[in-house]
Swiss-Prot record:
It catalyses: ATP + H2O = ADP + phosphate + H(+). Pfam families: DEAD, Helicase_C. ATP binds at residues 175-182. The keyword Iron-sulfur does not apply. This is ATP-dependent RNA helicase MSS116, mitochondrial. GO terms for biological process: mRNA processing; regulation of translation; RNA splicing. GO terms for molecular function: ATP binding; ATP hydrolysis activity; RNA binding; RNA helicase activity. Its main location: mitochondrion. One of its GO terms (cellular component) is mitochondrial matrix. Residues 89-99 have a biased composition (Basic and acidic residues). A motif (Q motif) lies at residues 130-158. The gene is MSS116. InterPro entries: DEAD/DEAH_box_helicase_dom (IPR011545), Helicase_ATP-bd (IPR014001), Helicase_C-like (IPR001650), P-loop_NTPase (IPR027417).
């Protein structure tokens, strides 16, 4: 049997060598059919039975530049990696020997819809205890998993853990959220960290794994998941974990580095410019991209490229080959290209999502309410909540809105309305302009409560795992079709049933048709809003903060411009019904928004619509719109506006009426508005801060 040597690693053709069990290599590279039959990707599948391994040998030493220090002694020079070309044929005797060991070496190159993860008759783990005495997972980790009450493997864990432990080229794993994905990469990275601790005699010897995620909230959730297992490990074998995320003080100490680091891209890129910080990453073994499709969607690819270059530059010559693991709910041509650049041109690929598996989990019951207009939509939603609170005391709901200002408005408005109409439910809110401590507190309180409502932006659409969410509600079309699936995925988790409810108006119906055509989304029940008991007038007697309302609708106009372009919706109709909602909220039938709010829409609007709903001026009825910037392609904010919700602190309760503003007992004005970031056309969301 021919052997190709990769540095210190040994790769037998078709068989990765472990100390006890031989496993087949997973499918090499990514098949075209997994990219929605895209013609952009023409690379044929690799026939691993032919035994061909191709690579170029290239080694280049790079210098660390820009620090003003000689870092050769500190971190060594860089080995960009070498590979050796070999061509070999498996003999018949070797094939027979493999069959005796019950190893499936068959890879059907024509079967591009399903790539088998592993096929071993004598090892099909269903519980973590099945790994005992295999030499794959250290007993100290298995005991810690048991103490943390992780006993049974989920389907993704059954398919993926062993290949992730054995891969030499790195791996792309397609997996849905809520399927046990975090534990899937936790185990191989923890195994590597424990081995490093043993080898170093319990001393800190640098970072072993870095996990890169799109949001602070997801980073903290993964951190908590690791801590559950680490609590069961003691003594010199126990690895340490820290985070490097925007908006919070680092828990990472480069002078005594933890073995595992969880990071958001912007903060990691910035900190790697520090020689001291970078020196802790010279012997990194694992790099994990979690929610990789979202990392690319929100515009982090240039940042990830920069991080990749930095890591390659600072790794020492004698470091083991870097293993990169990428997890994503969707895998398309763009992500495949990213994986080839960051992982390996012939990366291992495993698909844990069955070909005929619906985009939305079968445990999620999808319901649509067709509303007459935006006023009817918000009124019906409030009455829907009122009825649920009466009928289901343990109701736990997440409400998704498109902008941070929309979250602030609905949070304050619903809090007052619930108080006014004796609707007994706790309300929390979460978005990127709140401080990290406020966000963490809101999420923790929502998780802890048996019932409640969390109003949030897309920041919580991916990765955030809250047990017991019974309902997910969406009041606007998602900016991207894929986001719908991720939002509804917050319910129906861990085998429990959930309900996803979409409130939609006639001008937005093209969005529903796109959901069906692109994602196969069908609604089991479609109701008219009149079927809801609308006994409470949501708007009667309410006195909202006009500044908050102006901020909401100012940024909403830019969002409407974006979705009208994406889904080919009539901008005139969207503006008419939403400005009518604005008037109903303020109870001013002739109220108009500033013409500046329509700047992203102006070319699509009829002149009569512009005259009816907008006026020349500095900010609608009350000069609002400072503070958030919101959606759109321009900087909408101005200095002197309201920024009362972005800060840290205020002494009011997190539950009702908690404005969490900067300074004072009532969370008053901070005195400085913030301009908006560029809109979606620039690649990143205008709510970029939600993602770091």
């Amino acid at each position: 049997m021919m052997i190709a040597r990769f540095g210190k690693q040994v790769l037998r053709k078709n068989v990765l060598v472990s100390n006890r069990i031989h496993f087949p290599v997973i499918s090499r590279g990514f098949h075209n059919s997994f990219i929605n039959k895209s013609d952009d990707l023409k690379s044929p599948p690799i026939d691993i039975t032919k035994g061909q391994t191709e690579a170029k040998v290239e080694t280049k030493k790079d210098k660390f530049a820009g620090f003003g220090l000689d870092l050769d002694e500190l971190i060594g020079e860089t080995a960009k990696g070498s590979q050796v070309t070999e061509q070999t044929e498996l003999t018949k005797s070797e094939e027979e020997e493999k069959k005796k060991k019950n190893i499936n070496t068959n890879t059907n190159k024509n079967d591009r819809k399903s790539v088998p993860a592993i096929s071993l008759e004598d090892f099909n783990p269903s519980q973590f205890k099945d790994f005992k005495n295999t030499g794959l997972i250290d007993d100290v980790i298995l005991r810690a998993l048991d103490r943390a009450h992780f006993k049974d493997l989920t389907p993704i864990q059954q398919k993926s853990i062993v290949p992730l432990l054995e891969t030499e080229r790195g791996m792309v794993c397609r997996a849905k959220t809520g399927t046990g994905k975090t534990l899937t990469f936790l185990i191989p990275t923890l195994q590597s960290a424990v081995s490093r601790k043993i080898a170093s005699g319990g001393r800190s010897s640098g970072v072993d794994t870095v996990i890169i995620v799109p949001t602070r909230d997801l980073a903290l959730q993964i951190y908590d998941e690791y801590q559950k297992v680490l609590r069961g490990i003691s003594g010199s074998r126990k690895p340490h974990i820290s985070y490097v995320i925007g908006g919070m003080k680092n828990s990472f100490n480069p002078r005594n580095p933890s073995e595992i680091v969880i990071a958001t891209p912007g903060r990691l890129e910035a900190d790697l410019r520090s020689p001291l910080f970078a020196s802790a990453f010279t012997d990194i073994k694992y790099r994990v991209y979690d929610e990789a499709d979202r990392l690319l969607d929100v515009g982090f690819e240039p940042t990830l490229d920069s991080i990749d270059r930095s890591i390659k530059m600072i790794r020492s010559d004698d470091a083991e080959p870097l293993k990169s693991l990428l997890f994503s709910a969707t895998v398309d041509a763009r992500l495949d290209q990213f994986a080839k650049q960051h992982i390996n041109k012939k990366y291992d690929y495993i698909n844990t999502v069955p070909e005929d598996d619906p985009e939305v989990h079968e445990n999620i019951h999808q319901v649509m309410y067709k509303c007459k207009d935006a006023i009817d939509k918000f009124g019906s939603f409030f009455n829907y909540v009122n009825q649920l609170v009466k009928d289901s005391p343990d109701m736990k709901m997440m409400v998704f809105l498109p902008t941070q200002t929309a979250v602030e408005f609905l949070y304050s408005y619903m809090s007052e309305a619930c108080h006014k109409h004796d609707v007994d439910i706790d309300i929390f809110h979460l978005h990127g302009k709140r401080s990290a401590s406020q966000r963490q507190r809101a999420l923790s309180n929502f998780k802890r409560d048996d019932s409640g409502i969390l109003i949030t932006t897309d920041v919580a659409a991916r990765g955030i795992d809250v047990k017991g969410v019974t309902h997910v509600v969406q009041l606007f079309p998602s900016s991207e079709i894929a986001d719908y699936v991720h939002k509804v995925g917050r319910t129906g988790r861990a085998g429990k049933e959930g309900k996803a409810v979409l409130f939609i108006t006639q001008p937005e119906m093209a969005y529903v048709r796109r959901l069906n055509s692109e994602r196969g989304v069908t609604f089991e029940q479609v109701h008219e809003s009149s079927e809801i008991d609308n006994s409470i007038d949501f708007f009667e007697g309410m006195r909202p903060d006009e500044q908050v309302a102006n901020d909401f609708f100012y940024t909403l106009m830019s969002f409407l411009a974006q979705i009208s372009s994406t889904y080919r919706l009539r901008a005139d109709d969207l503006v008419a019904e939403n400005v009518s909602l604005y008037r109903a909220i303020l109870q001013k039938p002739d109220a108009k928004l500033s013409l500046r709010a329509a700047s992203a829409l102006i070319k699509r609007l009829n002149r009569d619509v512009v005259r009816e709903f907008f006026e020349q001026g500095r900010g609608g009825n009350n000069g609002g719109y400072g503070g958030y910037g919101g959606y759109g392609g321009s900087s909408y904010g101005r200095s002197g506006g309201s920024n009362r919700y972005s800060g840290g602190g205020g002494n009011r309760s997190e539950k009702r009426f908690s404005f969490a503003g900067r300074g004072g007992n009532s969370g008053g004005h901070s005195g400085r508005g913030r301009g908006g970031r560029s809109g979606y056309s620039g690649g990143r969301s205008s709510q970029y801060s939600d993602w770091e």
